[in-house]
Amino acid sequence: PALLRGAASCDLPTIGVSGGPMLNGQHQGDTIGSGTGVWKLDADLNAGLISEDDFVEAEISMSRSKGHCMTMGTASTMASMVESLGMALPHNAAIPAVDARRYSNAYLSGKRIVEMVKEDLIMSKIITKESFENAIKVNGAVGGSTNAVIHMAAIAGRMEIDLTLDDWERCGKEVPTLVNLQPSGTYLMEDFYYAGGLPAVLNRLLDKGLLYGEALTVNGKTIKENNSKSVCWNDDVIRTFDNPLTKDGGIKVLKGNIAPDGAILKPSAASPHLMQHTGKAVVFESIEEFHNKIHDPNLDVDENSILVLKNCGPKGYPGMAEVGN
């Protein structure tokens, strides 16, 4: 996302090439995901259910190739956003980092960027308000990270395109979560690629008339031209609209006295019984206070408590550090 922001400021011909996800983690006969697995193992370690040696062994089994995390976390989400914005060649989002097709994608992208320079196909000719709305809907369909909201807002700001939380709420209402990936579901990015990758998701959204099919992409073709014939090879990894992972896929925007300008929630990864919940607020004034107190056995907290972390936004801390897990 930072590279896209820089490219947007320059408004030059640009093409995105992601590094690709790691291979699936394999540990003691089970498939384990990177971020999702780490948080569970960390909780088990702190609870005394596993030893530190067990933790390290699982971590080694989890990160067994180069590439970014293979769950639908920030990296996989933003790779999907780049492709759905039209800023990368088809399949860029999901090809594993060590797959030969990842290198082919990079080679073809290198050839294509030379042609884009000759065609003067600059970024502002590709990314529009419509392509942002396409990406928001794709984020819902893949169960994408809440981090997409701040990254997409920053890219839109550089391009002087008005993108608000209201757009996320409006566009997200129409889309169920179709992609059955951790942390919302079962599978990982390697499985997603073999099942058809992002083109298969885009095709399903196009079939329902949910995307602006005429949105332009970096190869000079439209989203519809690139993806309308894409095939899904595994309906459990990429679900149909008749059998979604969750019916409410889009990012939800919450407003109230605690967050008058809006707070966001990823319904596909949320526990259904917490959608309406009342509990005691346990407030931490800083990340440092949170880390110092969260494992204190004397902390007045239980399973119904609501943890509130202050002074941890993109400006104040800075960087909006991830500590919620």
Q: Could you tell me what each predicted segment is?
A:
Residues 2-4:
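Short beta-alpha junctions and helix-cap segments that line functional grooves
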Residues 6-11, 17, 21-325:
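Catalytic or ion-coupling anion/metal-binding cores of large enzyme and transporter domains
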